[in-house]
Amino acid sequence: MSVIPMVVEQTARGERSYDIYSRLLKERVIFLGGEVEDRMANLIVAQLLFLESEDPEKDINIYINSPGGSVTAGMAIYDTMQFVKPDIRTLCVGQACSMGAFLLAGGTAGKRIALPSARVMIHQPLGGFRGQASDIQIHAQEILKIKQTLNERLAFHTGQTIERIERDTDRDNFMSAEEAKAYGLVDEVLASR
């Protein structure tokens, strides 16, 4: 069972309590924690759109601690990050693996950060399918298209060549925060504000 901390604030009208995530959202902080899946993606997309409507000029901060997850859910978040007007500052706390690393790299250039002990991992998309041979072939072609799209966007965000991205994502490729910076997945490694 998960317990979400509450924050109590004094206002002119008395006390007001928020769950910690709602309070941080007031400060334009979104937490992307855990597996990337459809429900999480819908919540994060909604938060991005809400924060854009509140102030389209002020940065949005996404703190990432994720082992990765669904490519389609991740792409919904990624596309919205690119779509909204505010700059998106991404910050890796803990880990940003697979789709988490892709979203970390998808932040606004110059505003992608990792904390010193963060771990980042990139790899090719995973998939599995059972069924008739012709259906398996259709799904295999689709995952290859997705792989190409992800590689092209990673190359764009990191400045690496598509050939290097293809090589480096062939298997799980783990990096320290400093290695992720050298690779172009993040712009800074920060120990303190």
From Swiss-Prot:
- Compartments, record wording: Cytoplasm
Q: Which residues does UniProt mark as catalytic?
A: 98 (nucleophile), 123
Out of the domains of life, which is the source? Bacteria
UniProt keyword annotations, A-Z: Cytoplasm, Hydrolase, Protease, Serine protease
Enzyme class per UniProt: hydrolase
Q: Does the keyword Thylakoid apply?
A: no
Q: Which GO terms describe its cellular component?
A: cytoplasm; endopeptidase Clp complex
Q: EC number(s)? A: 3.4.21.92
Q: Catalysed reaction(s)?
A: Hydrolysis of proteins to small peptides in the presence of ATP and magnesium. alpha-casein is the usual test substrate. In the absence of ATP, only oligopeptides shorter than five residues are hydrolyzed (such as succinyl-Leu-Tyr-|-NHMec, and Leu-Tyr-Leu-|-Tyr-Trp, in which cleavage of the -Tyr-|-Leu- and -Tyr-|-Trp bonds also occurs)
The cysteines covalently paired via disulfide bonds are none
What the protein does comes down to: Cleaves peptides in various proteins in a process that requires ATP hydrolysis. Has a chymotrypsin-like activity. Plays a major role in the degradation of misfolded proteins.
Cite the HAMAP family for this sequence.
ClpP
The subunit structure is:
Fourteen ClpP subunits assemble into 2 heptameric rings which stack back to back to give a disk-like structure with a central cavity, resembling the structure of eukaryotic proteasomes.
**Per the similarity annotation, which family is this?**
Belongs to the peptidase S14 family.
Q: What is this protein called?
A: ATP-dependent Clp protease proteolytic subunit
**Species whose genome carries this gene:** Pasteurella multocida (strain Pm70)
